[in-house]
Every structure is written in structure tokens, then in C-alpha cells.
Amino acid sequence: MAAATERTDELVREYLLFRGFTAALKQLDAEIKADREKGFRVDKIVEQLQQFVQSYDLAALRDYWGYLDRRLFSRLEDMYRPTVNKLKTSLYRYYLVHTVQTGRNDKAQEFFLKQASELQNQAEWKDWFVLPFLPAPDSNPTFATYFSRQWADTFIVSLHNFLSVLFQCMPVPVILNLEAECHRSSLIQEENESLRHKLFALQAESSRMKKEELEVEEAVVHHKLPAYVANMDRLGDSELDMTCSQRSTAHSLQSRGGFLSSLLSQSKKGPARPAQPSGASPTQTGSVLLGKKEPANHQSAKGKEGTASSKDGKSHFSGLVAGESSSLQQRQKRLQEHGKERRELLSKGTSQVQSAEKKADISTSEPEPCSEPQADQAETSTKMPASSTESVGVRQEQPFIVLSQEEYGEHHSSIMYCRVDCSGRRVASLDVDGVIKVWSFNPIMQTKASSISKSPLLSLEWATKRDRLLLLGSGVGTVRLYDTEAKKNLCEISIDEDMPRILSLACSPSGASFVCSAAAQSPISHMDFSVVTSGGKSMNQVPGKLLLWDTKTMKQQLQFSLEPEPIAINCTAFNHNGNLLVTGAADGIVRLFDMQQHECAMSWKAHDGEVYSVEFSYDENTVYSIGEDGKFIQWNIHKSGLKISEYALPSEATGPFVLSGYSGYKQVQFPRGRLFAFDSEGNYMLTCSSTGGVIFKLNGEDKVLESCLSLGGHRAPVVTVDWSTAMDCGTCLTASMDGKIKLTTLLAQKS
């Protein structure tokens, strides 16, 4: 409701300004500024009550609660009146406990003097009048419960939940329902689009079935990743070649039918062996599907006429018998696969027949999550191994209360980016299939805009001033400006034909410009995966450029100098005022740029391998970086290369991220989005893990990394995170390889 109210206020302002009602507009702004209901923001109302308690302002506390009672609680049915009275009693006791804990017994006595006439006839208050005169009330059995931290936290959460439910259930004017109506219309449009895609998919399947009925060859099956996904790989155009070899006494033929791959997923399918080892490096993005060898002893396919069995017992695939009976059996199995393939086609959101055929080739062996379901309730994490120079501890007292955890599940493939806008109201998410979703989560999750890119997308960034705009970097050398409210592209600019991969985008806090990292295609298209998984460093450091563009004119302002040689920049981040820019590159070097002089102020070798993610600290005197070597390091920006602290993180926090399935395949994704994020004061850090986000406490004095809270909730590895503190309650985003995004709302426990 708060989001709808805020949006309606903006619409009313726009209307009054359009009509020239300036006096009414000024009056509206004045009343909104003095709004005691805080725009139906529950967190703001609770914060206001806490401020009155902490300032010992009893009169203001009584007056504000009375206003809420008249304005909101009076609308409730009589059956809820006891609940309101209990909350009021708890609020007064919360005030009294605070006065005693802070040594202000005079305020406690003042409370009973002013409230005596109201409270003396209430049975629940008869024991409380002696409170100011007890020497140690926190040890008294009557009052000990109320002096515990648990009771105070429970009261705040109960009050927060009560107000939230009240705002969701109260009747609202018609104008506030406009957003819901728009959302309903959007859902209908999406449903129509989905049905249209389904029609195209069925037509494609029908055409393919007619062609395959004419083919009787059997086969070596050649699998390739679609170029759409392959171009996103950081090392280059990774492709997956699967060779099916058949040793039969009769013959060995090749099949041109792409749909034969669906037959191999049945009981007659043997293990796949890659023709060429393939791998990837974080200079290119995407998920790489790799074949995993299985035991090679399989029986040959059965047919009514019988087939010749494999002589050596070691062939990877057994033969399929050609003949009428075998063809009939194949067609029956194809029909069993049609439902699954159509769902896969619809989830990818394409209406092209060629694209549908490509996606069907890889949909038959979709990896399944190997981990058990994680409990939704947050729990304390175990101790994390540290490097030889730093230690990692376990924090016993949790600094946050988990208010809720929700799931956004409209993506159907691995997430690359997931970012909250500056206002903390909307989220933009991008998956490896080029599907962009813009959605809100307050008060309920709603998809505001959805788009499917024809060209592969590699990067995403919110504009800072006009937070309705998104910057989208592609794999074909272009950057698009997308309006999330109008749901259309405002413009598209070409960066560099020789540097087609836009690896990173960062918008200046002033909103006047943005930096763009462009990189060339990798000259190496295949790499041995064993090198990558064993921790080997990237051998493919491609050249790149770092460019500054004007946001208004969408013209290039300058190109930064990258020393010692031009290199692909993987990650970029501005400080709070945009005067400094920190970057992490494929050569392992962190560079700090002076944006006023437009030159590199300092650079240093930070990691053995590529730099995956960089961020400024809260005080901006240091920067943090995560690299291919699995280290999380803090650097002093006032002295080049001065290391303040270093921690060794597990591979599940730094990547590459691996999702294994029972089908024998592995899906591997290299880091692309943000790998860590800080809270509002920079004391806590959110990172990735195999089952959800993990929060650590950063302790600069003791140089330890304390594991505080495990958010959990994921069945697949988390590949990118974000932490929004624009609202009073922190919002943690964790996105995983199965396309699920968890949104966890945290309430900080003030010490």
C-alpha cells in the first residue's frame, strides 16, 4: 500500500502541475511533509514511536498513539480492540523500561503521575507503580521478562506486523487501485504473449516431426550450445560438442535430426563424451553446459527384430535398430518428450522456429539441483576457513532479525545480474537468456516490466537520477537505455565494433555520465575444463577499453588510459560523489581513477588471476576486492598496494559456480554480477554460498571475518547478491542458478 500511495502522490502532483494549480500543489506538498501516517510506511511509523520513547517525550507519544487510534484503529471491528489495548500497554511498558534502563527514574515517576488516573483501575498495572522505587527491577521476577532484549524485539516485530496487516486489509479509494488494475492488464498481455509463443512452438514441433519420420539413419549426435548463450561466455564462444559413437556389426551412420537427442535421454541413451574439452573464463559471461562421463558398459538398444550387441562393452552409446518397429518406438518416445520441450520453449520466450529447435537440443538434459532444500528460516552459519594471515570467527549473537523471506520465480534460467534501484523500491534482474524483469516488492511482489533481448546481454545498471531508466550492455557492442515505465528502448548506441562485449556499466552518482567497459572477443574458444576447476588461472586476457559517456547526449566523452596495456575491465564502482572510480581487470590489477582529472591515480596487482568484484568501503578510505584466487582483500587507497586485511573465501562465494544434476551434466557459470554487498554502515557483508546468502561482520580492529547469519532458502548456488538500505528495514537479494531470487527483509538489532 505504501508504494501505491507514493505513486499516487506523484500522479496527483503531476496532474496539479499540468493544470496549473500551484497553490494546491504547495498545500499538498506541505501536508505530505507533515503527514503523521508517513505515507502508510510501517517502518517509519514504528521509528517515530521509538524516537518518542528514546527522547522521553511522553506527551508526544500519547498524542501520536491517540492519533493512530482515531485514524486507523477505530476502523477495526470490536473483536480487535483487545489487541490494540495490549499493544498500547506494551508500548507504555516499553517506555518505562527504557527510562529505568537509562537511569531516568524521574521520567518513570512522571509517567505514573500523569497516567495514574487512567491506569490505577487496570489490573495489569497494579504491580507497576512500585517500579521507580525498586533498586534492581531487572532482577525482580515480576519485571525481569520486560527488561530482556528478547521481549523488546518481540514487541517491535509484533507492532510492525500488526500495522502491516492493518494497512493491507483496510479499504482504499479507487485511485489507489489503479496500479493493481494496470498489473492485472499486464498479466493478461503476458498470458496472451505466452499463448502466442506456444502456438509457434507447436507449429515448429509439427514441422520437425514430419521431417524426422522420413529419416532412418542412426547416429552420431552433435550438440551445440545456442550462439545466443555461447556468446555470453567470458572466455569466448564456448560450445559443447557431444559425440555419440556406435560400434555395430551392421553399420554406422550419421543423423541430421536435432531431435534425436531427446531419444538419448531415455533408457537407450549412453554416456556423452565431449569431443573437445571446453571451459570458460570470467572475462566472458554465461553458463556452460558440460558433459560428464558415465560408466561405458551399456546394453545395446532393443527392437522387435533384435540388434547386434556391442562387442567391446566399452562404447559410449549403443545402437538403435533401423526398421519400422524401431521407428514406431522412436516416435512414441518423441511424443513423451514433447510436453517437456514445449515448456522449455515457452520459458525461453522465443517465437522463432530456428531458436526453438536450438533450445530443444539442450532442454532434454536439464541439470537438477544436487543439494537438499534449505530451510527457509535463517540460521547461524558454521565457522568459515580463513587464510594464514587472518582468522574467521563465529558470532554468537545475531545482529539482525529476519522479518520475512519471499521468492521471485519468473526467471527460468540462471541469473546474471540482480540490482535494486536507488530508491529501494524496484529490482531489475537479468538472466543468461536475455530476459529482463523489473519488479517491485513493497507491499507485494509485482512485475512492472518484462523484456526479451534479441542480442545477448552482458551487463546491467540503474540510472541514478532518473531511476526509471536502465542501462543494458550487450555482446554485440551496443548499450541500450531502457525505460522501465514506458517499457521501451529510448535509444541504442554503438560502442566499438572491435570491442563488442560490454562487460560492465557504472552510472555516476551525479547522473551526468556513465562508464562503459568494452572487451574484444576471446581468441581462444575452447579451454580444458579441468584447468578451470582445479583453480588454474585464466590464460586468455583479452584487450579492452574503458570509456566515459555523457548520459544526456549519449556521446562518448573520453577513453581512459589502461596501463601497462589495454585489458578487459570486469567490474567498476563509483564512490558516493562520483569523484573516484575503482575498477577490477582481467590482469588482476585494481585501478583507481580520478574522475575530475580523468586519469588513473594509482594501480596495483591485487589478485593472482582476474578480479571479479570491487566495492568502496563505507568510509571510502579503502576498497574491497574478490578475485579468481578466492581471496577477499581490503586495500588502502591512500597508499598504492597497501593491504589492510586478507581472507580466503570458499569457492562457493567466489565462483566459478557449478550446478550438478543427476543426468550427468554440469552447468558452470563464471562471476558476472556483484559478489558481495554491504549494509548501510559498512559493518556487515553479504556474500554468495551454495544454499543462500551469508552475512559476515567486518571487524577492522581484530581483523576477523565473523559469520553472523545464513539466509538460506536456495536449492542452487547463489551467483550474485545485493543489499538495499534505502528503506528502514534492510533488504537482501540473493539470486541463484535455477532462476530463483530470494528477497529477505532484515531488522537490525540496535545495540
Swiss-Prot record:
UniProt feature coiled coil, ranges:
188-212
Basic and acidic residues composition bias: residue spans: 334-346
Q: Which UniProt keywords apply?
A: Coiled coil, Endosome, Membrane, Repeat, WD repeat
Which terms does the record give in the GO molecular function aspect?
Answer: phosphatidylinositol 3-kinase inhibitor activity; phosphatidylinositol 3-kinase regulator activity
Q: Where in the cell is it found?
A: Early endosome membrane; Late endosome membrane
Region (Disordered) location: 264-395
Q: Choose one Gene Ontology CC annotation of this protein and give it.
A: endosome membrane
Q: Does the keyword 4Fe-4S apply?
A: no
Q: What main location does UniProt list?
A: membrane
**WD repeat extents:** 410-449, 452-492, 497-559, 564-603, 606-645, 668-706, 713-751
User: Its biological function?
Assistant: Functions as a negative regulator of the PI3 kinase/PI3K activity associated with endosomal membranes. By modifying the phosphatidylinositol 3-phosphate/PtdInsP3 content of endosomal membranes may regulate endosome fusion, recycling, sorting and early to late endosome transport.
Protein known as: WD repeat-containing protein 91
> Which source organism does the UniProt entry give?
Gallus gallus
Name of encoding gene: WDR91
